A protein has these predicted regions:
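PLP-dependent class I/II
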Residues: 1-266
Length: 266
């Protein structure tokens, strides 16, 4: 927390907080967010913008805590959420922002220059399902309990599949993705030298690994250096992000491919 506070200057306008976090799956605890709130209280010129699009997808009995719910934070927090993650319809770009009136007004004024038009049928559909999601569903007390259980199992299944390939999963506390350690593999040089998406060559190891695994293993991860600042991207060299928001048949096939990949190391 000391490094976080040290990064604040008189020119700082906002602090962006993402929980559950993408790509790591970290869910910030109440105690951790209280520390963040304390920092913000000491710097009244800074507002908080919280990305909480995975708020309903927290696992192992964890609690999703909203920074805006803490003392003195409502007036200083813009909360962002989304229907696409919660209801497994990521192509429906329908989300919402809420907070104190003066903050929402500023968002509204900016938004009119960002979004040309909206998809009213999708908005009406999401408004309806938000009401129905609190009702009992598939033997669970509500839809949210069902979807948590559903994705928690997918997470566990993919984590076990990764282990078959000697890829060490960093088991997420929430969200759609598993970050994993791929350092057991030596990536062929040709995948390092092939130009990257913007023509750069050589590419970073995580890009080369993602390419190699796609071509040779039939499995495509995301190279996580895309989530880093250039000066810290080296920390992602031995990492890859895998998604478990997939149909069961896809995860079963992936398991078979991971098993085959693991056997190649022996």
């Amino acid at each position: 927390m000391g490094k976080l506070e040290a990064a604040i200057s008189p020119k700082t306008k906002l602090m962006l907080i993402n929980t559950p976090h993408n790509p790591t799956g970290k869910v910030f605890t109440r105690a951790e967010l209280e520390c963040v709130a304390d920092i913000l209280r000491r710097h009244p010129h800074v507002i908080a913008v919280t990305d909480e699009v995975y708020e309903k997808l927290v696992f192992d009995g964890r609690e999703h805590v909203r920074l805006a719910s803490m003392p003195d934070m409502w007036e200083r927090t813009i909360t962002i959420s989304s229907s696409g993650k919660t209801f497994s319809c990521t192509g429906w770009k329908v989300g919402w922002v809420y907070g104190a009136a003066h903050l929402v007004r500023a968002v509204t004024l900016a938004n009119q220059w960002i979004v040309f038009c909206i998809c009213t049928p999708a908005q009406r559909a999401i408004a309806t399902i938000l009401k129905e999601a609190d009702e009992p569903y598939m033997g669970f007390p509500d839809y949210y309990a069902y979807v948590r259980s559903h994705y928690e199992k997918k997470r566990d299944d993919l984590a076990e599949s990764l282990k078959l390939a000697n890829i060490k999963p960093i088991v997420p506390e929430g969200g759609f993705f598993i970050m994993a350690d791929t350092s057991k593999y030596e990536v062929p040089e040709k995948y390092v030298q092939q130009p990257g998406p913007t023509g750069e060559s050589p590419v970073t190891r995580d890009w080369a690994f993602a390419r190699w695994l796609t071509v040779e293993g039939g499995i495509t991860p995301i190279p996580p250096s895309a989530f880093y600042q250039p000066e810290t991207a080296h920390n992602a060299a031995n990492l890859a992000r895998f998604a478990y928001c997939k149909e069961e048949a896809t995860l079963v096939e992936a398991k078979a491919r991971f098993r085959k990949l693991g056997s190649s190391l022996h």
